[in-house]
């Protein structure tokens, strides 16, 4: 299944709000998007606020974006994830 890296610019939110958004994303996925897999997310602090980088697998970029919209989350940039580099395997 194709994998995607989603950049979400969340703005000036708290870590608690980020966690609430994650719970909402999980609930929407479980209820309406069983064909989407949320692998993990990284949360970073920028000068403009919180940003997340989320790795998802799904049948299409459109389906992943539909999940984000249904969860009320931005999907500011969505990239095709080509591969992972694992230093333990180099």
Labelled PLM ranges:
Residues 1-33, 37-39, 46, 61-67, ...:
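Short S/T/G/P-rich N-terminal loop/turn motif that feeds into the first structured element of a domain
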Residues 50-53:
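Short active-site oxyanion
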Residues 55-57:
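Short hydrophobic/aromatic beta-strand micro-patches
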Residues 73-85:
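Conserved short beta-strand edge segments in small beta-sheet-based binding/regulatory domains
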């Amino acid at each position: 299944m194709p994998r995607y890296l989603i950049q979400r610019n969340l703005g000036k939110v708290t870590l608690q709000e980020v966690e609430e958004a994650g719970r909402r994303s999980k609930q929407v996925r479980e209820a309406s998007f069983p064909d989407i897999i949320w692998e993990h997310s990284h949360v970073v602090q920028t000068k403009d606020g919180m940003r997340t980088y989320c790795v998802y697998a799904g049948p299409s970029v459109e389906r992943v974006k539909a999940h984000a919209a249904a969860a009320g989350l931005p999907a500011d940039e969505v990239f095709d994830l080509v591969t992972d580099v694992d230093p333990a395997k180099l």
